[in-house]
């Protein structure tokens, strides 16, 4: 295994987006893996040098991508201010040759199994774990903005890119990966790309004047736990990929469109699939939960459009919508009614106002530890979903001479009950959902007749 980098000679001090200042986000890395077939092993050295040169070009124009996230001014009752400051000359690249490792995946094995989650172990294919677990995660350890790992496997390679989540959301990470692919091809960056990458993060969300906290933040401020109550131990959970063909998605969208609420004129494929997942998980959870158990659907929303910011802005600019009901109501209502609930919260003006309210509240708060986008989600009955369907990773070739990726996956990390992701949508329209559920819910879901009509288990 080799890692390449050198100490930075640059000088910069970039305060993170106010929404990126949430303490939980500052300890997380978001990972994404792109898989390419390699027919000629003699290409590997050239691939490494191409990526190294691309990282140099990217860092010359945007030195902060090689920086680190550092929190300054921490004291009693103050979580400090997190910034990107210099770290190295280029983002660190780890090169790992797994071709002689019998436990490592091969391109043929991945293909035959449908690129399952279990074959993308973050401890093998990623340069750093998602969660701050294990060595290197102390308060004084560096948190690089960007980390990469190039894994050589028999017949192919897996390129994993880790982004520090306080510094970027997945849309921002995708913008950086796209520019890295351009840099590897020795293509120039446009003025628009340069301008978006260098936007002042402190002013992206204008603060509200004379703001008083209202119900718009109810789901985002953690309530103090009752004295003496220990939090329940997390349930034993597992991760799995499920895929949905374009035909299955079209049928789900048709079913939702036929049963829409009177208040809705339209739902997207993403709305219909999200609703189907909420309904299906609620249905299987009725086996262990009371019908009147509250359920909440927390759905990440890219705020670049509503805030009038470039779609390629690289920071963290997302919020969530929240939908409350009971397990039985969601399990039993028409699909279109559930999809309409999800669509109803996507009003741009309302989203913008809610995001400004959150930013304004956080700006005036010395101790931000009570703020979380999933502050009141109960993993036993709720869902927390991020859709990466629009992320462009299927298009990037990095000038490797290998064509476009054969698969794009998020590596497997510790199970986290009710956390879910939609992978970047395949060019043919197929969606893959990465779903974490407690074991008994997962087993019931895999056997559920309505679910298996549309979803294929990959593992």
From Swiss-Prot:
Enzyme Commission (EC) number: 2.3.1.-
Enzyme class: transferase
MF term (GO), any: metal ion binding
Recorded superkingdom: Eukaryota
Keywords linked to the UniProt accession: Calcium, Metal-binding, Transferase
Keyword Calcium: yes
Binding-site list for CoA: 253, 266-269, 302, 318, 343, 386, 390
Binding of Ca(2+), residues: 218, 221, 376, 449
Pathway per the UniProt entry: Sesquiterpene biosynthesis; trichothecene biosynthesis
Pfam families: TRI-like_N
Known role: 3-O-acetyltransferase involved in the biosynthesis of trichothecenes, a very large family of chemically related bicyclic sesquiterpene compounds acting as mycotoxins, including T2-toxin. The biosynthesis of trichothecenes begins with the cyclization of farnesyl diphosphate to trichodiene and is catalyzed by the trichodiene synthase TRI5. Trichodiene undergoes a series of oxygenations catalyzed by the cytochrome P450 monooxygenase TRI4.
PANTHER family: FAMILY REGULATORY PROTEIN, PUTATIVE (AFU_ORTHOLOGUE AFUA_3G14730)-RELATED, TRICHOTHECENE 3-O-ACETYLTRANSFERASE
Family: Belongs to the trichothecene 3-O-acetyltransferase family.
Remarks, miscellaneous: Trichothecenes are sesquiterpenoid toxins that act by inhibiting protein biosynthesis.
Protein's UniProt name: Trichothecene 3-O-acetyltransferase TRI101
Species this protein is from: Fusarium sporotrichioides
């Amino acid at each position: 295994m080799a890692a390449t980098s050198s100490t930075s000679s640059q000088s910069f001090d970039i305060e993170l987006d106010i929404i990126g200042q949430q303490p939980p986000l500052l300890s997380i890395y978001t990972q994404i893996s792109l898989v390419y077939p390699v027919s000629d092993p003699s290409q590997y050295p050239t691939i490494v040098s191409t990526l190294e040169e691309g990282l140099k070009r990217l860092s010359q124009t945007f030195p902060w991508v090689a920086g680190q996230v550092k929190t300054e001014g921490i004291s009693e009752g103050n979580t400090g201010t997190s910034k990107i400051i210099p770290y190295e000359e280029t983002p660190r690249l780890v090169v790992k040759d797994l071709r002689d490792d019998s436990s490592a995946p091969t391109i043929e094995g991945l293909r035959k199994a449908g690129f399952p989650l279990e074959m993308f172990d973050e401890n093998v294919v990623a340069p750093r774990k998602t969660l701050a677990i294990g060595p290197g995660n102390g308060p004084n350890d560096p948190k690089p903005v960007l980390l990469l790992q190039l894994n050589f496997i028999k017949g192919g390679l897996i390129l994993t890119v880790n982004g520090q989540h306080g510094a970027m959301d997945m849309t921002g990470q995708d913008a950086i990966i796209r520019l890295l692919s351009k840099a590897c091809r020795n293509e120039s960056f446009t003025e628009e790309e340069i301008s978006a990458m260098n936007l002042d993060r402190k002013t992206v969300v204008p603060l509200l004047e004379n703001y008083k906290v209202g119900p718009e933040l109810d789901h985002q401020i953690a309530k103090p736990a009752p004295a003496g109550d220990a939090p329940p131990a997390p349930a034993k959970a597992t991760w799995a990929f499920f895929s949905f063909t374009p035909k299955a998605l079209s049928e789900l969208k048709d079913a939702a469109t036929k049963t829409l609420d009177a208040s809705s004129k339209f739902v997207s494929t993403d709305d219909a699939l999200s609703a189907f997942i909420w309904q299906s998980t609620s249905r299987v959870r009725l086996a262990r939960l009371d019908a009147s158990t509250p359920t909440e659907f927390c759905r990440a929303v890219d705020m670049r459009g509503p805030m009038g910011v470039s779609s390629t802005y690289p920071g963290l600019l997302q919020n969530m919508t929240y939908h409350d009901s009971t397990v039985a109501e969601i399990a039993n209502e028409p699909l279109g009614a559930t999809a309409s609930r999800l669509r109803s919260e996507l009003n741009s003006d309302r989203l913008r106002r809610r995001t400004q309210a959150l930013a304004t509240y956080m700006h005036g708060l010395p101790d931000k530890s009570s703020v979380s986008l999933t502050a009141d989600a109960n993993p036993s009955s709720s869902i927390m979903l991020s859709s990466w369907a629009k992320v462009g990773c299927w298009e990037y070739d990095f000038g490797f001479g290998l064509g476009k990726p054969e698969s794009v996956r998020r590596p497997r990390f510790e199970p986290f009950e009710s956390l879910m992701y939609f992978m970047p949508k395949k060019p043919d329209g197929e969606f893959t959902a990465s779903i974490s559920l407690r074991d008994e819910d997962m087993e019931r879901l895999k056997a559920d007749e309505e679910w298996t009509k549309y979803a294929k288990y990959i593992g």
